[in-house]
Swiss-Prot record:
GO biological process: translation
Gene name of this polypeptide: rpsE
Family: Belongs to the universal ribosomal protein uS5 family.
Assembly: Part of the 30S ribosomal subunit. Contacts proteins S4 and S8.
NCBIfam families per UniProt: rpsE_bact
Protein name from the UniProt record: Small ribosomal subunit protein uS5
InterPro entries associated with the record: Ribosomal_Su5_D2-typ_SF, Ribosomal_uS5, Ribosomal_uS5_bac-type, Ribosomal_uS5_C, Ribosomal_uS5_N, Ribosomal_uS5_N_CS, Ribsml_uS5_D2-typ_fold_subgr
Amino acid sequence: MDFKDKKDDGILEKLVHINRITKVVKGGRRFGFSALVVVGNQAGKIGVAHAKAKQVPDAIKKANETARRVLIHVPLREGRTIHHDVYGKDGAGKIILRSAPKGTGIIAGGPVRAVCEVLGIKDIVAKSMGTSNPHNMIRATMKALSKQNSPKHIATIRNKKISDVIEKRG
């Protein structure tokens, strides 16, 4: 059974990282596995989870179930990119996400690409710095995406019209 991309009831599941973990006990070592998973509906909803179990399939299943419970909404511009450039940091992981014109594609590496694909982002440029640890990169990406505001939300806060908030975009 392939666990990489599993699509069920409109939710796309992507396995980002599997790690073998060891617990040292009096009688020796106990081995287990941890799984990092991102899930999303490819229309602005995303969930991230990390789970541990004795077997790989059990860890993936637990992570998928947890990620489905913690879905959050991320506003997208035209359903294909983010509204404005954002920066996120977690631990040593730093990420810069920039909106891109139509046809650019997903220019991002590793874990950040998985987040963009399950979120439904089609055009984005991402630069990750500091670490290649998938856990920190995913958390930094989620922090960056949660900082994003739609022009409608910004207009309401500033008591202005949406057209006054939106600048000429390329």
